Amino acid sequence: LDEMSWDEVEAKRISNEEEIAEQMGWKYYLPEAAQTKEVRQQLDEIQKQSEYKDVRDIKVIDPCMGSGHILVYAFDVLMKMYENDGYSQRDAAQCILEHNLFGLDIDERAAQLAYFAVMMKARQYDRRIFSRGIQPHVYAIAESNGIDSFTRDYFANNDPKLRAALDSIINDLHDAKEYGSILTVAPADFAALY
């Protein structure tokens, strides 16, 4: 920062963060996600399935997204799939944010980093993505401490299976911020909520 002010950086319109890091003398470290091959294989498998009709139907969820590496990688893979289906990059970026990518993390800061990473990836393909009001589906998991039985009953809507699923996740996420990564959340079917 001593050698270059932020105004000078902006004036040069350096758009590549690696270039900025290099010019500022910073260490730029963003390791590749170890799961990239697995993500690619799973998406290829989905695409080959006979029931695959529309790339918008593919859902990629990272339940422990951290800073969003897997989501960013999946974004690029999905972009190629959209392009193969005839979408423009701009339309594909919007569709990916709206229909395909979902991420959760217990850490609010990690969720913010993932939001930033996914939006920067979307901006790579659509320079006006911020003005479109599209928000990625990346969220910090909230504790269930404040959820009372009336709220649960409202969402369960007299469905005993849904009530049991809600009870399970409410119990599992009690004091979630305290327990963090040692939480174990039992699988549950929440399809009735939609």
PLM feature segments, named:
Residues 1-194:
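SAM-dependent methyltransferase catalytic region
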